[in-house]
Amino acid sequence: MWQFIRSRILTVIIFIGAAHGLLVVGPKFIRANQEYTLVISNFNSQLSKVDLLLKLEGETDNGLSVLNVTKMVDVRRNMNRMINFNMPEDLTAGNYKITIDGQRGFSFHKEAELVYLSKSISGLIQVDKPVFKPGDTVNFRVIVLDTELKPPARVKSVHVTIRDPQRNVIRKWSTAKLYAGVFESDLQIAPTPMLGVWNISVEVEGEELVSKTFEVKEYVLSTFDVQVMPSVIPLEEHQAVNLTIEANYHFGKPVQGVAKVELYLDDDKLNQKKELTVYGKGQVELRFDNFAMDADQQDVRVKVSFIEQYTNRTVVKQSQITVYRYAYRVELIKESPQFRPGLPFKCALQFTHHDGTPAKGITGKVEVSDVGFETTKTSDNDGLIKLELQPSEGSEQLGINFNAVDGFFFYEDVNKVETVTDAYIKLELKSPIKRNKLMRFMVTCTERMTFFVYYVMSKGNIIDAGFMRPNKQTKYLLQLNATEKMIPKAKILIATVAGRTVVYDYADLDFQELRNNFDLSIDEQEIKPGRQIELSMSGRPGAYVGLAAYDKALLLFNKNHDLFWEDIGQVFDGFHAINENEFDIFHSLGLFARTLDDILFDSANEKTGRNALQSGKPIGKLVSYRTNFQESWLWKNVSIGRSGSRKLIEVVPDTTTSWYLTGFSIDPVYGLGIIKKPIQFTTVQPFYIVENLPYSIKRGEAVVLQFTLFNNLGAEYIADVTLYNVANQTEFVGRPDTDLSYTKSVSVPPKVGVPISFLIKARKLGEMAVRVKASIMLGHETDALEKVIRVMPESLAQPKMDTSFFCFDDYKNQTFPFNLDINKKADNGSKKIEFRLNPNLLTMVIKNLDNLLAVPTGCGEQNMVKFVPNILVLDYLYATGSKEQHLIDKATNLLRQGYQNQMRYRQTDGSFGVWEKSGSSVFLTAFVATSMQTASKYMNDIDAAMVEKALDWLASKQHSSGRFDETGKVWHKDMQGGLRNGVALTSYVLTALLENDIAKVKHAVVIQNGMNYLSNQLAFINNAYDLSIATYAMMLNGHTMKKEALDKLIDMSISDNNKKERYWGTTNQIETTAYALLSFVMAEKYLDGIPIMNWLVNQRYVTGSFPRTQDTFVGLKALTKLAEKISPSRNDYTVQLKYKKSTKYFNINSEQIDFQNFLEIPEDTKKLEINVGGIGFGLLEVIYQFDLNLVNFEHRFKLDLEKQNTGSDYELRLRVCANYIPELTDSQSNMALIEVTLPSGYVVDRNPISEQTTVNPIQNMEIRYGGTSVVLYYYNMGTERNCFTVTAYRRFKVALKRPAYVVVYDYYNTNLNAIKVYEVDKQNVCEICEEEDCPAEC
């Protein structure tokens, strides 16, 4: 078969000057800190030697000299001379040239412009996965290389930035230090981040070096993959598409299930659909109805949904299938791009089927214009019709025509070459390319050669050259050693003079290896999950090695996250790339010529095609429960040992799948090494279990726990499968209550998934361990796994907490009584009582930082609860000189996540909004800006310009009177609604400006105008909420009326419990009281603030937070500020807890800051007494909880539910309608949320909401708890009906279902709510149990 494969681009530009028998060759490009080599050849028969002055010089655009180097050299007859120039490290951009002048009577002058290349380093990024879920950790490596693929000596650090899809800076490393050219770090993604494509960018000296993207989204990693391909290449004449559908688990075994196939033709309209049962592989034919094509090919779209049997897990694949008019295509391949008039021209028509195989037996008429060529030919076994054409001396163009008998037509023109000589030289490689081995080349010339020169070029420079003297031969065997300097790629150029014309040729050398010849292998290609695997590495002693392994299933999303051999080749080529021009070989080789009039350079010297050149390629037991199901692992760095090798033993995850393992190595001298392709290995067991468990169930429901058994041993076996009752959490339906396990037996044929299930009830709330073991052959082969499902209460849990605070400056003894307020209608057995002693005010806040509020946080304001408390905790820890570094690290890490979350709500004008891309909010922008400013003390990722822009936006919204009004929607009426002259919002914005040192100066006029407005309004403020924020603003400003405002605020307060507590009774009493406490701290009224603190701590949740975002923000801020003044450093006291007839003792000293708790309080206890004796500070907390049936709640919303008829037990469609019931005409709620919980066994897909009303649209939707709950957000609600339909699907079998519920409530006043229950099918145990599970009554 003929091969006409185009050679690759030469990555070194060379200039050649031939005059007086002198040939000068050198690189066209120069770089800083790199050698520049010039080669001068003397083939002058008259002069025994020539003397030359070489001058390399450069200057900037304004004439400043940046380089001036001269060298005197002499070159003897029939010899080469290599001259090296070392370019300085600090070489900068400029205009450079080299000049060669003859000396001592030798007349010669040539100069050439050189091109400065600034690119001296390149970068790569490796990420451990292509896609991440919220809450995942992103591991990444940055690799920086110089032009020789080594760590650059001058680059010690880089600037790394990670941005979210809106280009907000989420994390940055300003000075990321490189080790062996590598920087490695990670990013913890927040639980509710902005979904989409994120970006990692790397900068050096202010210029971007490299960037890479990864995706953040909700996804489920499929256990199997589906491939859809045409069974035969579809042609128009077939009028059908025949498809092969293959479904295999990632560990290679076939999947059984149903494939739903849909065909879409023109305009993306559904043409037809079919279903077929598939076990591993299936075929289906989709016939067209008069399908006509307008072109030679046309795409149709096929969508295949494959549903796995027993589990209903689904994989959807969409494919573009091309339908062709003809069964083949043709391409003209030529020995050279152009023909020479008067010389033979070889070419061929290559016929290929659309699958890439040669199309033989294609017959047609071949016509070539201008030469009178006409014949009928048939393609041979290689799909070729070979042609040897004889263009005449006067031929200008060849028009090659092919007409097949089936109507296929092809035409292409070939132009003549503008030539100066018929002579040419050819270089052919005649041996393999191997490191340190001899390479043999055949040099062939049409003229008898008296000399030729060869040049070896690599990495932008000439690394070797030679002057060869054949004895007037036309063929010569050139032998060169393949040195390490040539690796990974090089070029060999040969040149000679034939009759006053320089002719030349070249060959590419691609070693397919790197100087750092790193190798990685594993001891087994198939291994059991959870077992050890041995990795063997070899390379340069002491070299750095980076390893990574990930689940092959991730490649279904993307594979650009990893580093591959091809990436290294692209980096290398990127240093030396030149645009190829197939008609100008000088351009492609990077050559330009300088010569006298009587010596010319040939312009068409590519006589033959050449192959790409490549080198050869190197080559009675304990049962452990599978609990580690990672998607990526082995993200590890090691060093090669002194011997040049290293072994590593690692435990593989418990997942049954296929894995990709990759590795690279970096050595300071030999540079980068990487394995040729990822190592693929499989974790699979001869016998194993696959689970299909629900996310959650309700206590008391009968639930089918389903598993599938797989047997790969080639024969049928009886399997014993045991489900365990772990910690007495589980009841086996139809079995004795005392059973600790339940064993079933089932026959498992080979290579077929066999389902087995257990009918159970959950006895306890919380997390229930599901532990299952299966064995065959008397236990010779076993598998076991353990997972957790959540057990939810039948009713709504009602958590409560009573708190007393004490602060003894000297020794005291005091008793605190606690009477528990437990509803008489509480569910039996649901009561839990706990005592907790906190020697530190923020202990529980710190412990629960990542879970302060149980309510949804799906808008820009609520989301701040994941950000602000971390700032307050860090303020407190630093203010009190805490040495608890792990707490500081936890708060800082969560602060970063909260920042990520919040950046979702940044608007294009620099402000912040309550929803993504929904418009700006004055209130929220003030809230976020002041928080970001404070947070910047603890994380450098926050852009000061971003905070400044938000505050500038705020300042621009001030009214001429000094007042601020909300520009966006109102969802927090008291703050934003403009009620009572807008005092609350104006005060709030002023506090944001006053708490920012830059804004306080920049916007001093805005602040002054605002304070004037507040002081003018002070006499008319009668609302405690407004006054509390205004007073705090005046305190921050140091206003002359601050004392008057505080006195007025104190007059509005309420004292109770013998003046041990003080608070302000408004609809926002926690927020109001907290602002008042902040003013007390600013006024240094610490002792007077303690009664306020007493009341505030009594309002807290079990987690240490308050009911809502603003309560938590201001409440914790106030408590923190006072707590900083009341240090627990003097604690020394004893606490007695008395209940019924029992007593429990606790001793506290100044070194204890963690809480102590006691859980063993009987549930029928109604009263506790706690005695404290000693000196110090502490919180006494009695936490209790009970479940209350849903019918016992009062309603302030109208809520209606309608279960629609779907005709199927597997689909649930629930119509939900809600509206606010106002006390005053036309009044509205604050932000309203509707939460729909689903019955056990049902889950929603990604888009569950339809048929929503549009008068008051839904602003946001959250899917929670594994798809078992959906939350809808509204700005507010009035009397209008707000309706939507939610659709869910039954994925698991459940009997005795508890009712599910829908709740609607006002986020800022949760006393305004409504709850309704609903039920679905009332299946009993007998309807879902299998024979051996069924109780006697069935």
Curated annotation (Swiss-Prot):
<feature type="glycosylation site" description="N-linked (GlcNAc...) asparagine">
    <location>
        <position position="637"/>
    </location>
</feature>
<dbReference type="GO" id="GO:0005576">
    <property type="term" value="C:extracellular region"/>
</dbReference>
<feature type="glycosylation site" description="N-linked (GlcNAc...) asparagine">
    <location>
        <position position="828"/>
    </location>
</feature>
<dbReference type="Pfam" id="PF17791">
    <property type="entry name" value="MG3"/>
</dbReference>
<keyword id="KW-0325">Glycoprotein</keyword>
<feature type="glycosylation site" description="N-linked (GlcNAc...) asparagine">
    <location>
        <position position="68"/>
    </location>
</feature>
<keyword id="KW-0391">Immunity</keyword>
<feature type="glycosylation site" description="N-linked (GlcNAc...) asparagine">
    <location>
        <position position="242"/>
    </location>
</feature>
<dbReference type="InterPro" id="IPR019742">
    <property type="entry name" value="MacrogloblnA2_CS"/>
</dbReference>
<feature type="glycosylation site" description="N-linked (GlcNAc...) asparagine">
    <location>
        <position position="813"/>
    </location>
</feature>
<dbReference type="Pfam" id="PF01835">
    <property type="entry name" value="MG2"/>
</dbReference>
<feature type="glycosylation site" description="N-linked (GlcNAc...) asparagine">
    <location>
        <position position="312"/>
    </location>
</feature>
<dbReference type="InterPro" id="IPR001599">
    <property type="entry name" value="Macroglobln_a2"/>
</dbReference>
<feature type="glycosylation site" description="N-linked (GlcNAc...) asparagine">
    <location>
        <position position="481"/>
    </location>
</feature>
<dbReference type="InterPro" id="IPR047565">
    <property type="entry name" value="Alpha-macroglob_thiol-ester_cl"/>
</dbReference>
<dbReference type="InterPro" id="IPR011626">
    <property type="entry name" value="Alpha-macroglobulin_TED"/>
</dbReference>
<feature type="region of interest" description="May contain the cleavage site">
    <location>
        <begin position="580"/>
        <end position="609"/>
    </location>
</feature>
<dbReference type="GO" id="GO:0140546">
    <property type="term" value="P:defense response to symbiont"/>
</dbReference>
<dbReference type="Pfam" id="PF17789">
    <property type="entry name" value="MG4"/>
</dbReference>
<dbReference type="InterPro" id="IPR040839">
    <property type="entry name" value="MG4"/>
</dbReference>
<keyword id="KW-0882">Thioester bond</keyword>
<dbReference type="InterPro" id="IPR013783">
    <property type="entry name" value="Ig-like_fold"/>
</dbReference>
<dbReference type="Pfam" id="PF07678">
    <property type="entry name" value="TED_complement"/>
</dbReference>
<keyword id="KW-1015">Disulfide bond</keyword>
<dbReference type="GO" id="GO:0004866">
    <property type="term" value="F:endopeptidase inhibitor activity"/>
</dbReference>
<keyword id="KW-0964">Secreted</keyword>
<feature type="disulfide bond">
    <location>
        <begin position="1329"/>
        <end position="1334"/>
    </location>
</feature>
<comment type="function">
    <text>Plays an essential role in the innate immune response against bacteria, fungi and protozoa infection. After proteolytic cleavage, the protein C-terminus binds covalently through a thioester bond to the pathogen surface resulting in pathogen clearance either by melanization or lysis. Initiate the recruitment and activation of a cascade of proteases, mostly of CLIP-domain serine proteases, which leads to the proteolytic cleavage of the prophenoloxidase (PPO) into active phenoloxidase (PO), the rate-limiting enzyme in melanin biosynthesis.</text>
</comment>
<feature type="glycosylation site" description="N-linked (GlcNAc...) asparagine">
    <location>
        <position position="199"/>
    </location>
</feature>
<dbReference type="InterPro" id="IPR041813">
    <property type="entry name" value="A2M_TED"/>
</dbReference>
<feature type="disulfide bond">
    <location>
        <begin position="1326"/>
        <end position="1338"/>
    </location>
</feature>
<dbReference type="InterPro" id="IPR011625">
    <property type="entry name" value="A2M_N_BRD"/>
</dbReference>
<feature type="disulfide bond">
    <location>
        <begin position="1217"/>
        <end position="1283"/>
    </location>
</feature>
<comment type="subunit">
    <text>Heterodimer of a TEP1-N chain and an TEP1-C chain non-covalently linked. Forms a complex composed of TEP1-N and TEP1-C heterodimer, LRIM1 and APL1C; the interaction stabilizes TEP1-N and TEP1-C heterodimer, prevents its binding to tissues while circulating in the hemolymph and protects the thioester bond from hydrolysis. Mature TEP1 and to a lesser extent full-length TEP1 interact with SPCLIP1; the interaction is induced by microbial infection.</text>
</comment>
<dbReference type="InterPro" id="IPR002890">
    <property type="entry name" value="MG2"/>
</dbReference>
<dbReference type="GO" id="GO:0140367">
    <property type="term" value="P:antibacterial innate immune response"/>
</dbReference>
<dbReference type="InterPro" id="IPR050473">
    <property type="entry name" value="A2M/Complement_sys"/>
</dbReference>
<feature type="glycosylation site" description="N-linked (GlcNAc...) asparagine">
    <location>
        <position position="728"/>
    </location>
</feature>
<keyword id="KW-0732">Signal</keyword>
<dbReference type="InterPro" id="IPR008930">
    <property type="entry name" value="Terpenoid_cyclase/PrenylTrfase"/>
</dbReference>
<dbReference type="Pfam" id="PF07677">
    <property type="entry name" value="A2M_recep"/>
</dbReference>
<protein>
    <recommendedName>
        <fullName>Thioester-containing protein 1 allele S3</fullName>
    </recommendedName>
</protein>
